[in-house]
Regions:
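Alpha-helical recognition/docking segments in bacterial nutrient-uptake
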Residues: 1-15, 44, 59, 67-184, ...
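Hydrophobic packing within well-folded, soluble alpha/beta domains
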Residues: 14-23, 28, 38, 46, ...
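N-terminal helix-turn-helix DNA-binding module of bacterial transcription factors
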Residues: 1-70, 348-351
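Short beta-strand segments enriched in small/hydrophobic residues
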Residues: 20, 27-30, 65-79, 189-206
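Non-catalytic, surface-exposed connector residues within folded enzymatic/regulatory domains
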Residues: 11, 39-43, 58, 66, ...
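Bacterial carbohydrate/catabolite-sensing allosteric modules
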Residues: 2-6, 52, 93-98, 147-154, ...
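Residue-level preference for short helical/loop micro-motifs built around acidic side chains
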Residues: 36-40, 112, 283, 312
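Small/polar loops that bind or transfer phosphate-bearing groups
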Residues: 30, 75-76, 106, 130-133, ...
């Protein structure tokens, strides 16, 4: 006899509803599960009995019967990052409109945690999975879901060797444009700062573990190289997850006059450290970033950013996934959405 753990009362079962509606258990199950045939009069009696008794469907039982859970899993890299909060909201808006619940899990950008999250979602029998992959170059943690024919869509990043739909922003073009703004202002000693883990100093041609960061670095380095800056890769700073202030201090000591932050959290840490060091933005150091976080428009000065269509990235990923769940067998899609420059007051010519 199932008991509700919250109030200690016996849970209302399909059998209870069937008895109250004076129909068979199989008929009540069909009506409550939304499958099979039943007359309108029978449906009305069953639904009225269910409402009167306070019946709540057993999600697992419904999944076993219909093969669908009407749920979607989403795995993000860092739930504290505003990017993932907005992308998740976009996915949730589309999922809700289509009748799906969303289950959110965090990978902390680690493949092992991502693999565990995949296992949890498969155990919950989700109908499909959205993932911002922890690694572009080694997506082995995602293969179980693909091998089990569970629809999957990647967002924000791609993953080598996985034939699945992807939705990303045009990070290559966005980085080139940010770098060009600084070059046009007269800067030559421009640094790019990211928290992505990387074993060695950055070298041109080396793939980074996140395709979004890799595209940004390549766009940044390409713009500087085209402008004749000698060995622009030497200005790329990685592995700053726990040490953005230390990286900024070293850059200032090295005579850097401008910084491109790979996301708004890095930009915020850099902004604070420059203030701590007594450096004025943009008079002493220019600062630009990816992502139009709220603080970038409220700070003094406002920060020039490359705004990503974050809500739309999540929403489009969910749309693609729901189409796959419905059986769409079209070739996989790689959707690239444009970014938008928000020009504020954080760029000035370098001091002579």
């Amino acid at each position: 006899m199932p008991v509700d753990p919250l109030n200690g009362r016996r849970e209302v079962t399909v059998s209870d509803v069937a008895a109250a509606a004076k129909v068979s258990k199989a008929t009540a199950a069909r009506v409550l599960g939304g499958y099979g045939a039943a007359s309108e009069a029978v449906r009305d009696r069953v639904q009225a009995a269910a409402e009167q008794l306070g019946y709540h469907p057993n999600a697992l039982a419904k999944t076993m019967t219909t093969g669908r859970s009407n749920s979607i899993g989403i795995i993000v890299g860092d739930i504290e990052n505003p990017f993932f909060a907005q992308a998740t909201r976009g996915a949730a808006d589309v999922a809700k409109a289509a009748g799906y619940d969303l289950i959110l899990l965090n990978s902390d950008e680690h493949a092992v945690a991502e693999e565990n999250a995949i296992s949890v979602l498969l155990a919950k029998r989700v109908d499909g999975i959205l993932v911002a992959p922890a690694s572009t170059t080694d997506p082995s943690s995602l293969r179980e879901a693909v091998e089990r024919a569970r629809p999957m869509v990647l967002f924000d990043r791609v993953a080598d060797g996985l034939d699945v739909d992807t939705v990303v922003a045009d990070n290559l073009a966005g980085a080139r444009r940010l770098a060009q703004l600084l070059l046009d202002a007269g800067h030559r000693r421009i640094a790019f700062v990211s928290t992505i883990a990387h074993a060695d100093e950055y070298r041109v041609g080396v793939r980074l573990g996140s395709s979004s960061v890799d595209d940004r670095v390549r766009g940044f380095v390409g713009a500087l190289a085209d402008a004749g800056v000698d060995d622009p890769a030497r200005f790329v700073r990685l592995n700053a997850r726990d040490g953005v202030p230390a990286v900024v201090r070293a850059l200032v000591d090295d005579g850097i006059t401008a910084i491109v932050a790979s996301d708004s959290l890095i930009a915020q840490a850099a902004f604070r450290e420059l203030r701590t060091l007594g450096r004025r933005i943009p008079d002493d150091v220019s600062l630009v970033a990816f992502d139009d976080a709220d603080w970038t428009s409220l700070s003094a000065p406002g920060i020039t950013v490359m705004a990503q269509p974050i809500h739309e990235i999540g929403a489009e990923a969910a749309r693609l996934l729901i189409r796959r769940i419905a059986g769409d067998g079209a070739p996989t899609e790689h959707v690239v959405l444009p970014q938008r420059l928000v020009d504020r007051e954080s760029i000035a010519p370098p001091r002579s």
